[in-house]
Amino acid sequence: MKKNWLKTSIFVSLSVSLMICGLVAAFSVTAARGQVTDIKVEIKEVEPFVYCSLSRTGSFSDIEAAVGELLQQMQIQNVFPMGSMIGIYHGDPTLSDPEKIQWEVGFPINEQALVQAPLQKKQWTFTNVAVSLHEGPYEKTGETILKMRQWLEDNGYVQNGPILERYLDADPSSTSPDRLRTEIWLPCKKG
């Protein structure tokens, strides 16, 4: 069981580094104005959950090292994931200096799990989220986020929390890039 978890984690680590490249590229593009029609967005009520993560500030260039450290520390501390790997991106990368962006990589965990530094135990508390499923290469998730933000604006919502991405494929290395699935959450409220 532990061996399979580690193998899957390594595959996820490599794939997530590609996903971050997509965020960086897409956030340098401005969203088109007008009605967004080629994306499905739903407003959902989600349950708060506990997760462990490694937090970073700055460019996404060390994502691979951060994921590797996360997985290593979880294994050392016997902290087991209770769901898909997540990435959380604080602030607005389209407006922020890339060297000041705060981001996290992590996994949902059992709330009784004991977590020690450098891992942090946190709780996702945003319960009203806009949700869209991005299907395709991780490098293009940023395009979906921009479309979701436009959808929020067009429908009278404002984003009021960090971007959360859930990486749904257990073994991204055995999935065609065009079939990779990333669920994107944007916390929101009526504007």
Language-model region placement:
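N-terminal hydrophobic targeting signals that begin at the initiator methionine
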Residues: M1-K2
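A solvent-exposed interaction/effector surface
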Residues: W5-G191
